[in-house]
């Protein structure tokens, strides 16, 4: 069975944040601290192996932990950050969370690791109703598949998951875990719920 200590983790903070008015979402304040700090707190309670993927504010993110850009200039979405994480991190298994989900559970890593089987390429969190495509754990052996996927212009992570041996980790006991804060309205709406 895959152990959490055998994994490295990347916080995805490389998006354009259009719905947030172009603000760097990692530095948007939620409950008195930047969203990036919520993500770091979640992971630090479970692992020491954390990096950030960002395409701007690199110096600011680097104050927290190792930070790297992805190699794509056209913002192909979270898959670019996942590719960068798989290439840059040392372990065979690399996990990913978004910077804008401040309510992820403190047993996230163990739940994802427990779902891994011998032939698993990717584990994706599932809340009982929907898959959560950017809360995931991936094996480095899929790098060539991501390369080919992006080279042909595909961007939808779910399509990549169909090309790989993907399994789901059950997070149905955590109904509010995957609230994603994409806009000022969502910050206000969920600020009192979480």
Swiss-Prot record:
Enzyme class: transferase
Keyword GTP-binding applies: yes
Sequence positions that bind Mg(2+): 100
Alphabetical GO biological process terms: bis(molybdopterin guanine dinucleotide)molybdenum biosynthetic process
Catalytic activity: Mo-molybdopterin + GTP + H(+) = Mo-molybdopterin guanine dinucleotide + diphosphate
Binding site for GTP: 12-14, 25, 53, 70, 100
Location in or out of the cell: Cytoplasm
GO CC terms: cytoplasm
Gene Ontology molecular functions: GTP binding; metal ion binding; molybdenum cofactor guanylyltransferase activity
A Pfam family this chain is assigned to: NTP_transf_3
Keyword Transferase tagged: yes
E.C. numbers: 2.7.7.77
Cofactor(s) recorded in Swiss-Prot or TrEMBL: Mg(2+)
Family (UniProt): Belongs to the MobA family.
UniProt note: domains: The N-terminal domain determines nucleotide recognition and specific binding, while the C-terminal domain determines the specific binding to the target protein.
Described function: Transfers a GMP moiety from GTP to Mo-molybdopterin (Mo-MPT) cofactor (Moco or molybdenum cofactor) to form Mo-molybdopterin guanine dinucleotide (Mo-MGD) cofactor.
Name of the protein in question: Molybdenum cofactor guanylyltransferase
Provenance organism: Aliivibrio salmonicida (strain LFI1238)
